[in-house]
Amino acid sequence: MKKTLALLVGLSAIAAAQSAGAETLKVAVAQRGFWNSTFIDIGLKQGYFKEAGLDIEILYTEGGASTLTPVIAGSIDIAMTNGILGVVAAYAKGMPVRIISAEATGAAEAFWYARPESGINRLADTNGKTVAFSSPGSSTNLILLQLINQAKVAPKLVATGGAPGTLTQVMSGQIDVGWSVPPFVLQQLADGKLVIIARGSDVAALAEQTIRVNVANVNALKEKRDALVRFLKVLSRSIDWAYSDPHAIDNYAEIAKVPRALAQQTRDDFFPKQALQLSEVKGPRRHPETGARVQVHHRADDRRGGAGNVGHSL
């Protein structure tokens, strides 16, 4: 596993991209409505991609395999916000996918919840209960494995897909504990209809670990490398805008279709900007399921603006 991870994130520096004509990139974006799924939309609205000579075609997915599969098949150039376990598994099987940047470090945004009448108030109450995560290999899969190992409990883990569908399953009694990321479920929590029983931030070991990455198809790396460099630079610029421009919250409230106050809470309380840095990929010391010791640590040379490196060196 250590060798696999070391190879997987062998990011190699390349020269900064020169100005070029508009080039199309097809991008899969997971979980529309999440704060970190809006950065491509920001880049389009602000004209950043146009300035960089890029046309972006977006495919929105529910995350996990639905994001990773099309990039492996080659129908998509880039897949955003992939759980690192799923990417490692795909690479280990020889799939044509490579990490191009970190996406999320730490797990401040994810949480697990239950209905108050269920009697489940903390993770320790979940022995034999059904506890949700989005999909195998996703970041919620990784976080939940760490949480249950830390709490020493034995729930039944269930892949439930996206946050809206998971909420429906909890409210209808199909599962005991759901997962979410803001702004989803915040209103139900405020209304007392649900209670948080665990947070990703409860796992100290994840605070400095990359849990999600952005990846590209191998052929895209070979044929569109210059465009991928420009894409990452625009992504970095869009993230900066989202944390500095006063209109960012209004923009997000409109996209997520939530009140402005919930949009503000989502960004300020659950998505610290430093967690969304792109240049440094860090890995776990031990695999959460096998216990095998692994280590990933790569810091891209960001002297050319923080996104002049695209990884493939395999």
What is the predicted role of each segment?
Residues 19-21:
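Signal peptide processing junction and immediate N-terminal pro/mature segment
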Residues 1-7:
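Bacterial N-terminal signal peptides that target proteins for export
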Residues 164-255:
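Pocket-lining segment of extracytoplasmic ligand-binding domains
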Residues 222-300:
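Secondary-structure end/capping motifs
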Residues 14-17:
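N-terminal signal peptide c-region/cleavage motif recognized by signal peptidases
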Residues 23-164, 169-172, 176-182, 193-199:
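Short, glycine-/small- and polar/acidic-enriched structural segments
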Residues 51, 202-207, 272-280:
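Short, solvent-exposed loop/beta-turn-alpha elements that line the ligand-binding surface or hinge
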Residues 293-314:
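C-terminal solvent-exposed extensions
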